[in-house]
């Protein structure tokens, strides 16, 4: 699961030790905390998508349009709270659940459909 992404000339990561979103402008030599709130829950995965960062957490799907400084709820359904990984698949987002199901979204994570 990519807990480290490249976005707008920065490395952005989930620090699993403290659930903070951190960034580096020097290729990971040093890290600066960017988001340390708890309203989104525990971050599980990040993906850059259409100029935003999409995150899956134990509370659902969130997005940031300002490099992870703030996060806006996209989908907090019971199914979205089971997502453990998210991936950019071109024209859609893919998300895998903790029980192995695959979902896709064609509207930047607002709604999800289980792939059969």
PLM regions and their residue ranges:
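Repeated scaffold domains used in trafficking and secretory/extracellular systems
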Residues: 1-8, 40-49, 80-89
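Tryptophan-centered short beta-strand motifs
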Residues: 31-32, 71-72, 112-113
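Loop/turn residues immediately N-terminal
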Residues: 17-21, 59-62, 99-102
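Blade-level signature of beta-propeller repeat domains, shared across WD40, Kelch, NHL, RCC1
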Residues: 100-116
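Surface loop/turn motifs at the tips and blade-to-blade linkers of beta-strand repeat domains
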Residues: 35-39, 75-78, 116
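Entry beta-strands of beta-propeller and related beta-repeat scaffolds
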Residues: 4-13, 51-55, 90-95
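Short coil turn/linker residues within repeat-based beta-strand modules
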Residues: 18, 28-29, 68-69, 109
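Conserved Ser/Thr-centered positions that define the repeating blades of beta-propeller domains
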Residues: 24-25, 64-65, 105-106
């Amino acid at each position: 699961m990519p807990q480290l992404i490249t976005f707008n000339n920065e490395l952005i990561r989930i620090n699993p030790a403290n659930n903070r979103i951190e960034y580096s402008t020097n290729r990971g030599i040093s890290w600066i905390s960017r988001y340390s709130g708890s309203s989104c829950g525990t971050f599980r995965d990040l993906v850059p998508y259409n100029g935003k960062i999409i995150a899956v957490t134990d509370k659902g799907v969130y997005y940031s349009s300002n490099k992870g400084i703030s996060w806006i709820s996209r989908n907090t359904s019971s199914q979205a709270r089971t997502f453990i990984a998210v991936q950019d698949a071109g024209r859609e987002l893919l998300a895998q659940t903790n029980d192995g199901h695959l979902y896709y979204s064609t509207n930047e994570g607002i709604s999800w459909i289980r792939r059969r």
